[in-house]
Amino acid sequence: MLQTYAPIDFRNNDPYNTDFEDIYYNPALGFAESDHVFIAGNHLRERFSALPEYGRFTLAETGFGTGLNMINAAAHFLECAPKTAALNLISCEAYPIELETLKRIHHHWHHHELRIALYQNYPHRASGMHLIRLHPRVCLLLLWGDATRCYQACMARVNAWFLDGFAPSKNPQMWQPELFREIARLSQPNATLATFTVAAQVREQLTAVGFNVHKQTGFAQKRHMLSAVYERPLSVEKSWTDYPAPKFDTRPIAVIGAGIAGATTAYELAQRGKVVHVYHDPENPCASAVPVAVPFFLPGKTDTPMRQFHLAAWHDLCRELKCCPQGIVDRMPIALAVAEESLARRKESLADLFEPEQADIEAKKLYFYQAGALDTPRLLTYLLADKNITQYAQKIAQLTPQAEGWRIGEQIYARVVLATSWQEQLLPNALQKRMRTVRGQATFFALNAPVAGEIFCAERSFIPLPDRVHMHVGSSYSVNDCDRMRRTQDDAEHAEACRARFPQHAIQLERAFVGIRAASRDYLPLIGAVVRAESVYQRYQKWSKDRNIPINEEIDYYPQLYMHSGLGSKGTLTAFLGAKILAAMMLGDPLPIDRKLLTSIVPTRFLVKDIIRGHLNN
């Protein structure tokens, strides 16, 4: 779904929302107002200064608007907090401001570097979650959509709130009891809150959900404002999708596997300030080493969890590709064949999901415009070159549990991530059978003349290389097959398909690549903590008789053991978002995905399905 852009009128060069008939901030003293109401109202400078080394702080807001409060908070954090501390910002907006309008609003503001980082990755108006890195130590999770629905989807541990937005008299639909319940659910004990409004309904609703509310001196012409402290945490029902609390530890994190799942995970953890050791088996190259790959997905007919996850991953990937060095992305349209009887429905569905410059349908093809072909070896090299990452060419055959963590060789790690694709020997038995091997062979051809710069994906993908006279065709798809030997039959089928696609060209077979991928049995990745199967089977066994029986039970996990695997043929599409989700789980940061989707991606889902289907012996 696409959100509606805010209707902005400039009055004396200051933004005015014509729908709500209100200003966004004090025209003359916007930053001073933000300092008084939100920064001082939450005692943020003192709290930022008091953070421990490597501390993390989460700040959430109910109305992003022009971004003034978020940029201001980030600037104060960078000035006050320890150099190893990190800030997570969350802000929602039902009516985002168009980028060019936002730049006009900002033209006289300070904090140039923060603004440029925002502009570089500012999302289109697609609803949902969009994670932006404003600074190596500051992340902003933008939630486009209704405030209540956005925060219902959110999973975070919030330390302070900016209760902002147009006044209750102007925007009553935002200031609803459901929003205040979500604020309480997400708040840490002793979380603080500040707001410009002193309306009775706001005071009453904050008090009702557990906040101790006080009137304070307001800013400029406003006599009062409110500050509050969360003193009565609500009881929250436990779920099998809950994941372990983060463990504070400055020791390196081990990532086993250096394919696209392992590399993106290591990179994301390194970007969040963690030291990472990556282990890879030199005798078993990963499928991600294929010379070229294309990220694509076909939006389905219905709004399934898979479509939601793939759509979120696509938007996240497009932001990541903007930041990649030259030579990694060969930008060209990605075309997918569309059946003629589906054209009208596809076009209507597309209009609800994308701007025309992002995706469109032309000549019976669905085009995506913001990505292209990826040089995967270069991409992996770039990701693993981060200064916080060290690589070890070493096969890991065993993980040994210790009181203080996991032993790998002579090193003990508090946290370990398994990104070992189809090589499952390090996984518990209950999770080993949840993935299957998929053999894929791609063939490369030389053409006698250049072709157009367009990727075409149907039964096979046709990817022109940068010189446009060499073509990647593939790949084959053979389930439960881990044979790495090249097959002439696959080459012959690819050659036939290439001739049919380019009948006017002569082709010459040059080389082939064989990779073995791991695909989950439901075609979605496994991302999250590694569960102790017996705890799930024991505590949720009643679901074998009735899935609707309420169960409020925690489950047990192997201590600080995680996995990112089962990406299948969608690795380049989903790996970046999967890595962000996993890093957030490990570090206690806000999840960049709707929490309802956890039921579709955490490894525990397969054990729960076993119970419901009566397959406990499988």
Swiss-Prot record:
It is found in: Cytoplasm. It catalyses: 5-aminomethyl-2-thiouridine(34) in tRNA + S-adenosyl-L-methionine = 5-methylaminomethyl-2-thiouridine(34) in tRNA + S-adenosyl-L-homocysteine + H(+). Its EC number is 2.1.1.61, 1.5.-.-. SUPFAM superfamilies: Nucleotide-binding domain. GO terms for molecular function: flavin adenine dinucleotide binding; oxidoreductase activity, acting on the CH-NH group of donors; tRNA (5-methylaminomethyl-2-thiouridylate)(34)-methyltransferase activity. Residues 1-231 are annotated as: tRNA (mnm(5)s(2)U34)-methyltransferase. GO terms for biological process: methylation; tRNA wobble base modification. One of its GO terms (cellular component) is cytoplasm. It comes from the Bacteria. Residues 256-618 are annotated as: FAD-dependent cmnm(5)s(2)U34 oxidoreductase. Pfam families: DAO, Methyltransf_30. Keywords: Cytoplasm, FAD, Flavoprotein, Methyltransferase, Multifunctional enzyme, Oxidoreductase, S-adenosyl-L-methionine, Transferase, tRNA processing. Its main location: cytoplasm. InterPro entries: FAD-dep_OxRdtase, FAD/NAD-bd_sf, MnmC-like_methylTransf, SAM-dependent_MTases_sf, tRNA_MAMT_biosynth_bifunc_MnmC, tRNA_MNMC2, tRNA_S-uridine_synth_MnmC_C. Coiled coil: none annotated. Its cofactor is FAD. Catalyzes the last two steps in the biosynthesis of 5-methylaminomethyl-2-thiouridine (mnm(5)s(2)U) at the wobble position (U34) in tRNA. Catalyzes the FAD-dependent demodification of cmnm(5)s(2)U34 to nm(5)s(2)U34, followed by the transfer of a methyl group from S-adenosyl-L-methionine to nm(5)s(2)U34, to form mnm(5)s(2)U34. In the N-terminal section; belongs to the methyltransferase superfamily. tRNA (mnm(5)s(2)U34)-methyltransferase family. In the C-terminal section; belongs to the DAO family. This is tRNA 5-methylaminomethyl-2-thiouridine biosynthesis bifunctional protein MnmC. The gene is mnmC.
